[in-house]
């Protein structure tokens, strides 16, 4: 088995698909043609950032209330082994990207991760995702 198969590729974004009406799409294309945006992705990213900024206070309050880790949170094998030695379990709550190292075994993940609530994306091997499926909210 190639070594690359054992490693997770770092990602900095997640691809999404949306359905738009033809008139809305035409308006976007017109703004691109007029030079307001470089392409459709630029328009959509800008629109999303503007909406997130518009609701920024509510988002910040919700993040604090829910006690979410914001941004990137990585869980290495050493991290989880330390949790296991202490006889503890983790309740992982992340707004952003949570990653679990490729060398973490499904048994170690199940022994140390009691629950996962990810608002954003989880990057882990398919075996880890399958092992934790019943703990994801």
What are these regions (language model features)?
Residues 13-30:
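Short amphipathic alpha-helix starts
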Residues 67, 72, 91, 97, ...:
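Detector for repetitive beta-architecture
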Residues 63, 79-91, 102-114, 130-136:
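Short, T/G/N/S-enriched strand-turn elements that build extracellular solenoid repeat scaffolds
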Residues 53-86:
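Short, positively charged interaction helices/loops
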